[in-house]
Amino acid sequence: MRILSITAQKPHSTGSGVYLTETVRGFKELGHTQAVIAGVTREDSVKLPEGVGFYPVYYNSPELPFPVCGMSDEMPYESTRYRYMKPDMVDKFEAAFGSAVLRVVKEFRPDVVICHHLYLLAAIVREKLQDMAVWGICHGTDLRQMYTNPTRAREDTPGDSRAKQDMLPACSAKDGDSELLRRRAG
């Protein structure tokens, strides 16, 4: 199977990044062909298993002139909080990741796309790839973003209703998150 994993964050520096990297490693051991799209800076050194295609989307660049967007308020590197993103930043985020997704899908031709975090990027991917299998992995902090930034999620997320309908049921709810899921998905 050809698997494309996507994250807006660095694939080594946080729990979800390590989870992505280890999932890629596990799929490689099972013999799957893979590629990864991730948001990084040009200074980052990304180490994925040999043979895994890497397609960076660069922050602190003309395309995305701000630090990496982080799901947590405190990240282990300089980051942008989603709640402070202005509409022009959201537009640049959508343009950069949206074009990368379309380019990589055309080139790599995945059977399935796995999005890490059910927030802005997952909704963009779902909107761009309406006829493809798109799986979402919930890491918990994405639920917090939806809860603490409901206006941003509702107004600035393209395809938000469809993303919630298609992807939120894939969440593994815990510690009261199931009520949040019901409110958000309904």
Regions found by a protein language model. Give the residues of each.
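A conserved catalytic-core segment of Leloir-type glycosyltransferases
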Residues: A38-A100
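Membrane-proximal helix-turn-helix segments that form the acceptor-binding/catalytic region
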Residues: N149-L168
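Alpha-helix capping/helix-boundary segments
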Residues: R42, L120-L121, S172-K174
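A short, active-site helix/loop in glycosyltransferases that binds the activated sugar's phosphate group
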Residues: K164-G186
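Active-site proximal beta-strand in glycosyltransferases
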Residues: V112-C115, V125-Q145, M167
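Short N-terminal targeting/anchoring amphipathic segment
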Residues: V90-K92, V101-L120
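N-terminal subdomain of nucleotide-sugar transferases
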Residues: M1-Y58
